[in-house]
């Protein structure tokens, strides 16, 4: 897990991701991490691995990468102490919001493509959030408009 102690980043041997959703964007994340593994490791300084994938259709995941473990219960991701970051790419408000809350309460960092999260949830609905919890917003349109990696 990435930790900051007085401005110094400490990285684990690898960063483990729990991926929620395997549609167009989620499938793209699987392919980018698989196809550019060496470059990502070089730039980040440690490997980034998808440890588990939450998917309604396991066959989609296995078509992209047969080695990825597929789960159907969010608790298998939020309860896994080895998962550092939960990447939410479900594509609909529900159950994405509930899953993100569970992940944050379990001490995971969350990356989501739901830019309008605050509008969906209302002003006070994230009052349970602690100062140590992190939500990062990813505008997935950017990924399609510009290359992530130069060859």
Regions found by a protein language model. Name each.
Residues 90, 95-106, 113-151:
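Rossmann-fold NAD(P)-binding glycine/threonine-rich loop
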Residues 18-21, 111-112, 137:
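Short glycine-rich or small-residue beta-strand-to-loop segments that form or flank ligand, phosphate
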Residues 86, 110-111:
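Hydrophobic residues within beta-strands of alpha/beta enzymes
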Residues 2-105:
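N-terminal glycine-/serine-/threonine-rich beta1-alpha1-beta2 phosphate-ribose binding loop
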């Amino acid at each position: 897990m990435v930790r900051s102690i007085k401005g110094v980043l400490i990285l684990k041997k690898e960063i483990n991701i729990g991926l929620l959703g395997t549609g167009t964007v989620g499938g793209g994340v699987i392919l980018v991490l698989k196809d550019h593994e060496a470059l990502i490791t070089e730039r980040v300084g440690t490997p980034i691995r998808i440890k588990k994938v939450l998917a309604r259709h396991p066959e989609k995941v296995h078509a992209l990468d047969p080695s990825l473990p597929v789960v159907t219960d969010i608790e298998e991701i939020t309860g896994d102490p080895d998962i550092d970051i939960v990447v939410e790419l479900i594509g609909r408000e529900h159950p994405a919001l509930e899953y993100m809350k569970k992940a944050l309460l379990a001490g995971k960092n969350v990356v989501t493509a739901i830019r309008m999260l605050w509008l969906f949830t209302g002003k006070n609905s994230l009052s349970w959030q602690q100062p140590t919890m992190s939500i990062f917003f990813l505008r997935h349109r950017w990924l399609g408009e510009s290359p992530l990696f130069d060859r």
